[in-house]
Amino acid sequence: MTTAIILFQLAIVLTLIFIGARVGGIGFGIYGMVGVFILVFGFSLPPGKLPIDVMLIIVSVITAAASLQAAGGLDYLVGQAAKFLRRHPHHITFYGPLVTWLFCLVAGTAHTAYSLLPIISEIATSSKIRPERPLSVATIAASLGITGSPVSAATAAIISSNLLGAQSIGLKDVMLVCIPASFVAILVAAFVQNFVGKNLEDDPEYQRRVREGIINPNEDAMKMQVAESVTNPHAKRAVWAFLLGVALVVTFGLFPQLRPQFTIANQTQTLSMPETIEIIMMASAALILLVGKANVEHAVKGSVFGAGMNAMVAIFGIAWMGDTFFSGNLPFFQTHIATVVTQFPFLFAVALFFMSIMLFSQ
């Protein structure tokens, strides 16, 4: 009977995830909270633990990134990236994903990659290279950048005391593993993609669309050049302010002894890494707005802030529903599943893979 009830609960959870995915945006969070309501009030499961630190890190990093966008810093970085990529157009399949990866590695969020994708597509098209080659790798590279980013919520969650932090694994360890691993993975993926499909000059379908005016490469190139020519004299200062925040996070992550210490109840405690990221990135946002002379309203209305807040609401509902389901049925999973996962650890990675597909998120 217990197994049937848990399977029924799992069906409800998966159904609500699917509905949220179809609705999109904050629908993830909304339908996730519907799941929490059903599990708590319908099945009397205790509410799970909210990922407060992850949510607050997303808020702080997205606020800093949105301030950077409002100050023109993001456009400045995109312009610099475009200049670099245009100097190496025939290597766009390799350099496009690597630049995207570097953007997300520094920014701590994949939402900053949106501005790069049209440029990568245009440069690939003008070089007669199938845009799908660099774009398919670039979208994956954005997520890989998050895994090794010192300011991403994913990294902070990994090194928290609930996960690897309890095993004395810190920011330095995660970066030493994830950065080289993701870099090599991108190179391998780009090498494979370099042989996918025909070049555009040999593709009859592409040539047909150009002849019929469905695709106009010259017009697309002109639009990109106009967008890249827009400059803001304060943008460079905003970029340096953002990079200063990232550098401070890396410094405090690599050298925990530099973080402030407090005596609470006769015990010495060190400022945690999630709190360090939250404080520094919010302070960086203030500095960016100051030196970049940005309008706060523009930061809130920007694409980065909107996408980031959607992600936070989604995590609010989905993560709470997932933790409520698993923690509420923990004895069952420990009895029936823990042994299998212990014997075959790769099954956990497979489960994460399919859940990420359903959630459209890492």
Can you name each region flagged by the protein language model?
Residues 19-21, 31-34, 40-41, 45-129, ...:
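Membrane-embedded alpha-helical segments and adjacent helix-loop junctions characteristic
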Residues 160-164, 260-269, 334-340:
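Membrane-interfacial helical/loop segments at transmembrane boundaries in membrane proteins
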Residues 9-12, 98, 174, 280-283, ...:
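Transmembrane alpha-helical segments of multi-pass small-molecule transport proteins
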Residues 69, 195, 199, 255, ...:
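Juxtamembrane transmembrane-helix termini
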Residues 121-217, 223-238:
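Membrane-core helix-loop-helix motifs of multi-pass transport proteins
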Residues 1-65, 205-325:
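Hydrophobic transmembrane alpha-helices of multi-pass small-molecule transporters
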Residues 16, 100-103, 145, 181-189, ...:
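Alpha-helical transmembrane segments of multipass membrane proteins
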